[in-house]
């Protein structure tokens, strides 16, 4: 969960080549094109490298990704890094990723950092982030309304700022853990990655209602992270919030397809249906003219009229990356191609180097900041878009954008690094052992 409100990513080229060679040989190979498997990377084993397609040498692309990781994870702590080591405990080293601007730690950033680490074969960083998450954020008490999930926000010393849950974090934790099991195998306890993923995934849809002290005080009742009937991620699992609603950027059909194969067997059909429900929601919430989607939505696809939810703002620009990666991995829903085309046409019309990052759905600009994270996500839409010339413009815009630093480097930087991984074909599927 990210908002600008109170509640609200360079080693020697030789080493980089070794890493990327491993990436090209150890991910899950193509399962074969079929109606069930789709026609994307899961079926074919082929991940497009949009930078190479645009004419950049593979070695330069590889070096760029590694340099970005090094800056954000191990750069100058004053104005470059978002990853910070934090001692150790009985489970090993601890580390967190912090939102520099808001002086806090969020499950969003921790889970993003873990999936980046899994993709880039950085086991030490992965384990340290997972250890910190469990040490400080995990709701362990069985009478806690948040039991089995993670408090979404804390200070850098681990003191919780909120007990509430933001389901985007749990979803990325699960996917990162499955990929870790595929890359490195499973260890013991906290580092039995697949067992941890299975348990959390099961709770996301099956955990019962628990009433107790939670959130901002008082007695609250929280349940599972998904609306089980609509098969959609909730903005928050507090069931006494009426009506319940969703955040389109929490919808990750590319992940749900994998969970329908790798997760607990009794839930395979559920996750397959959830993938389709998310694709259908995208088609409802996205403007057919601008390609923009609201920050928050009701389950029927209408914008949620609260918390600024009717506008393209805050979390909203992550959504296009979700549907574009879904097309890249699965290739099941051609509507995603049209949505990417509409979005690219809109932002191109606003000027490739100066479009803003907040709009009404009909295209009136609300905020003029040219966000580096949005540049990255818009480049990802080239994975699904159909106009080669225009798609290349968006890829080149990301290539020409420097690694975020300074005050905004948390959200912009993590989205930027994930954008580099997606556009270089190195954000891949790693089947768990």
Where are each of the predicted segments found?
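Solenoid-repeat scaffolds in large eukaryotic assemblies
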Residues: 113, 125-126, 190, 197, ...
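Bacterial Sec-dependent N-terminal signal peptides
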Residues: 19-37
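Bacterial N-terminal signal peptides
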Residues: 12-20
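Extended ligand-binding clefts on enzyme/binding-domain cores
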Residues: 33-74, 78-81, 103-107, 142-148, ...
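Bacterial N-terminal signal peptides that target proteins for export
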Residues: 2-11
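Alpha-helical support elements that line or immediately flank enzyme active sites
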Residues: 111-123, 133
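Solenoid-like repeat scaffolds
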Residues: 397-407
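Aromatic-rich carbohydrate-recognition surfaces in CAZymes
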Residues: 103-110, 158-185
């Amino acid at each position: 969960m990210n908002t600008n409100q109170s509640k609200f990513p360079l080693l020697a080229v030789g080493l980089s080549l070794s890493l990327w060679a491993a990436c090209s040989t150890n991910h899950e190979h193509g399962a074969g094109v079929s109606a069930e498997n789709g026609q994307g990377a899961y079926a074919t084993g082929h991940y497009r490298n949009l930078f190479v397609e645009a004419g950049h040498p593979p070695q330069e692309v590889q070096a760029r990704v590694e340099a970005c990781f090094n800056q954000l994870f191990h750069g100058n702590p004053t104005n470059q890094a978002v990853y910070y080591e934090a001692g150790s405990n009985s489970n090993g080293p601890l580390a967190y990723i912090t939102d520099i601007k808001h002086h806090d730690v969020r499950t969003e950033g921790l889970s993003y950092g873990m999936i980046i680490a899994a993709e880039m074969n950085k086991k030490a960083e992965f384990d340290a982030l997972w250890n910190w998450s469990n040490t400080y954020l995990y709701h362990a008490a069985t009478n806690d309304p948040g039991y089995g999930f993670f408090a979404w926000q804390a200070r850098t010393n681990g003191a919780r700022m909120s007990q509430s849950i933001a389901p985007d974090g749990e979803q990325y934790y699960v996917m990162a853990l499955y990929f870790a099991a595929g890359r490195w195998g499973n260890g013991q306890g906290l580092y039995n990655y697949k067992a941890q993923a299975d348990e959390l995934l099961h709770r996301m849809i099956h955990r019962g209602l628990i009433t107790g002290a939670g959130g901002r005080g008082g007695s609250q009742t929280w349940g599972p992270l998904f609306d089980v009937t609509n098969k959609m991620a909730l903005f928050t699992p507090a069931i006494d919030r009426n009506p319940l609603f969703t955040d389109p950027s929490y919808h990750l059909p590319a992940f749900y397809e994998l969970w329908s194969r790798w997760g607990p067997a009794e839930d395979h059909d559920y996750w397959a249906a959830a993938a389709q429900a998310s694709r259908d929601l995208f088609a409802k919430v996205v403007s057919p003219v601008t390609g923009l989607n609201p920050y928050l939505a009701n389950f029927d696809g209408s914008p949620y009229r609260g918390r600024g939810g009717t506008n393209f703002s805050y979390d909203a620009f992550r959504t296009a990356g979700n549907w574009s990666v879904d097309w890249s991995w699965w290739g099941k829903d051609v509507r995603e191609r049209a949505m990417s085309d509409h979005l690219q046409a809109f932002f191109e019309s606003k000027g490739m180097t100066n479009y803003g990052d907040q709009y009404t759905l009909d295209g009136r600009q609300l905020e003029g900041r040219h966000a580096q994270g949005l540049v990255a996500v818009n480049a990802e839409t080239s994975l699904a878009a159909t106009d080669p010339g225009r798609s290349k413009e968006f890829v080149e815009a990301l290539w020409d954008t420097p690694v975020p630093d300074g005050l905004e480097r948390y959200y912009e930087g993590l989205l930027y690094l994930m954008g580099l991984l997606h556009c270089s074909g190195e954000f891949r599927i790693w089947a768990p052992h």
